[in-house]
Structures are given as C-alpha cells and as structure tokens.
Amino acid sequence: MYLLLLLIMLNMLMMSMIYLFMLFMNKMKNNLNLIIGNLIIINLLLNLFNLNWIDWIYIFCNLSFNMYSYGLIMLTLWIFGLIFISLNNNSLNCLFMNLLLMISLLLVFLSMNLLLFYLFYEFGLLLIFYLVVKWGYSENRWLSGFYLMFYTMIFSLPMLYIIYYIYLIDYSLNFMLMEMLNLNLNMMLFIYLLMSFLVKIPIYLFHGWLLKAHVEAPYYGSMILASIMLKLGGYGMLRLMIIYKNEFILIQKILVMINSFGVLILSLMCLSQFDMKSIIAISSIVHMGLMIMSMMTFLKISLIGGYLMMISHGLSSSGLFFLVNVIYSQTNSRLMFINKGMINFMPSMSLLWFMLCSSNMGSPVSLNLISEVMLLIGMISWLKFMMLILMMYCLFSFIYSIYLFMFINHGKIFIMFKIKNGILVEYFVLLLHWIPLNLMFLKLYFI
C-alpha cells in the first residue's frame, strides 16, 4: 500500500516538473502549438495508470475502443503532442490540418463500423496527401503525392464495393457482430480487401509510394506516416484476422514467403542508400514485413508481438525522422556524404542518435526488443526453417542501424560552416520519444 502511494506521489512529482518545464518553454516561445502540445501530453500522462483497465468495451454511436485500439490511440495522441510542441511553422493552416488529421486518425481507431472505418481511413490519406504537396521540400512533391494517391486509391476505391457486398450478405458492418457470426467471403473479394490494407502497411512489392512520400514530406509528415499511418494497415489486418480467419489460413504461406524475401532484400537495400530518410523509411517497411510475417501464424504471442511492434516502431521511427530534420534544418541536406562527423558539432545530439538507433535495432531494454522476441518465437514455433531467415534479419537490422549512426556521426568533416548543438525543445521532444520506448517494458501486463 505504501509502495503504491509512493509511486503515485513520484508520478505526480514527475508530471508537475514536466508541466513547469512546458510552462517555461511557453514563456520562451509563446505560440499556440506549444499550448496544444502541452495539453495533449499532460492529459496522456494522467491516463498512464489506466493501461490495465482496457478489458471492457465502451460503445457510443459506433465508436468504441478495446485492447487493439487503446495503445494506438495513446500513440497517436503522444506523437501529435510532440509534433505540436516542435512545430516551427506558425501558419494556422498547418496547425489546423494537423489537428484535423489527428482527429481523423483517432476516429479510425475508435470506429466499430466497417464503413466508418473506411471513410475516416481515406479522409486521413487525403489530409496526408495535402501535407506532402503543400509543405513538401521540392517540386518532386507533386510526383510523390501522385504515387501516394495512385497506390492507395487503386485498391481503396473497390473496397467501397466490397463493403457494400458484405452488407448485402450479412446485414451488418459492425465489427463485434461480424466477429460473432464467423463469416465467409469470396476469395477474390477477400484478397482485394486485404490488399487495400497491405498496400498501406506497405508490403514488399507495393512499397514504392512510401519511399517517395517520405523523401518529399515535411518532417512532421514523415513522423505521422511512419508512426501512425503505416499502423492503420496493421490495425485493419488485426480486425480482419478475427473476422475472416479461414480465408487468412488459405493464403498465410504466400504472405509469409513474400515477406520473408522482402525483409532480407529491403535490409540489403538499406546498406546501399545515401539519403538518411530513405534508410529510415526502408527500415520501417522491414519492421512491418516482420510483423505481417509473424502475425500470419495466428499464435497469441505473435499477435501480441505484432501489436507491440506497431507501438514501439512508431516511437523509434518518429524520433529518427525528427533527428534527420534537426540536421537538415542546419545543413539543408539529407545526404550522409555531406553530413559526416556530426559528433564534433553536436555531441549531445549524437548520443540521442545512438540511443534511438540502438532502440530501432532492438537493443535492451527497449520495447522493440520485447516485440521482436515475441515475433521471432512465434515464427520459429510455426516453422523451424524460418530460424535461418530470422537470424539473417537480426544481423542485417544490426548492420544498417549501426551504418546509419556511424556514417553520420563519425568520419571526415565536409561541412565548413558552423552548426549549433540543438535547442532545448529538440532535446525535449527526442527524450519524449526515447523514454516511453524504453520504460514501457515495466508495464506490459496491460496486454
């Protein structure tokens, strides 16, 4: 009892210190972005003790949350809170679009109706398209926006017909009812429905749009894409796996085979990239490929591991994209050949590079390690032969993470002008990426 009271008092003290620190930053930089970000972070911290109270489902007007969506809702609020704190763009249009996108993504995770899920899902894609083409870095942002809309809409528009077909057969689009009815769907329609989610994860062979979008998107667009938008596909797959388990079993070996080769090929591609954003974007596809591959085993440990992978990767990839922006804002380049020897200019930021790169490759005690161990156990339990492929994945993941860190922070210096070590807000945002990523293992019983 006394230990519980002590923990609560320490938590209140920590929140008070963070709140005072945020107020201090508001005095230093008084704008609406920081105020909104502060409110989101504080409200989120107040709910951290409720993570184990998610066994029940609250339903109101087809909106609900349960174990599958609660963690992703928390991730969405956390990432957008950090984005609002770090925004340098004082445009109300930019702030409004990010707020609208946050609400849209929250409604996706809260939707218990397939049609509402689809509508909010596509509305979020339109908003991220607008962010890319409006605040992108170069003229190629229009081409990136075209890739984004072409790859996603070519599978998303027929999904509306499939939803209508499901309603004609089952007379309901409610996820809870569809789970209880144990429904079956025509195999061709099921594959098309599944592809609309796999393209957005994205699966190997359909990943071209993500690389284009990441390279041209503003830093907050990349943070949203990597940490939340990719997880929409994984969340949709989780919902479908419960409803259409028989159909998934028929194609599980095909998906495992495609993703096992894709994980290895894309890991090698990381070692041939010179753009920092490209390496982080490809590593995101690799992590999502491992998640799909393991979830296809339908083992409980694999499903939990995939769920934790979505949360952990959302934090680590978002932090890495923010680090790239810290360098880009001073050198106007993302090429690793130019941005070398950064440890001489910004030693404190180099430490954060190492902390987030090590978390990204699954080092102790990050949540990435726990999720990857669960996924590897699930795969090896399903098929012993997968051990060889998974060993190669772990090796390549370590190599490209160290390659990214070493190439940027060490080596001969090419930059001849002065670089600052970073500002207070940047360190605060980066620490709020790393701290929950490495402390969440203390409270895993909520799963």
Curated annotation (Swiss-Prot):
The keyword Transport applies. It is a multi-pass membrane protein. GO terms for molecular function: NADH dehydrogenase (ubiquinone) activity; ubiquinone binding. Its EC number is 7.1.1.2. Keywords: Electron transport, Membrane, Mitochondrion, NAD, Respiratory chain, Translocase, Transmembrane, Transmembrane helix, Transport, Ubiquinone. The chain crosses the membrane at residues 4-24, 34-54, 67-87, 100-120, 149-169, 189-209, 223-243, 248-268, 279-299, 304-324, 349-371, 388-408, 422-442. This is NADH-ubiquinone oxidoreductase chain 4. It is an enzyme of class 7 (translocase). GO terms for biological process: ATP synthesis coupled electron transport; electron transport coupled proton transport. The keyword Membrane applies. InterPro entries: NADH_UbQ_OxRdtase (IPR003918), ND/Mrp_TM (IPR001750). It is found in: Mitochondrion membrane. The gene is ND4. It catalyses: a ubiquinone + NADH + 5 H(+)(in) = a ubiquinol + NAD(+) + 4 H(+)(out). Its main location: mitochondrion. Belongs to the complex I subunit 4 family. GO terms for cellular component: mitochondrial membrane. It holds the Pfam family Proton_antipo_M. Core subunit of the mitochondrial membrane respiratory chain NADH dehydrogenase (Complex I) that is believed to belong to the minimal assembly required for catalysis. Complex I functions in the transfer of electrons from NADH to the respiratory chain. The immediate electron acceptor for the enzyme is believed to be ubiquinone.
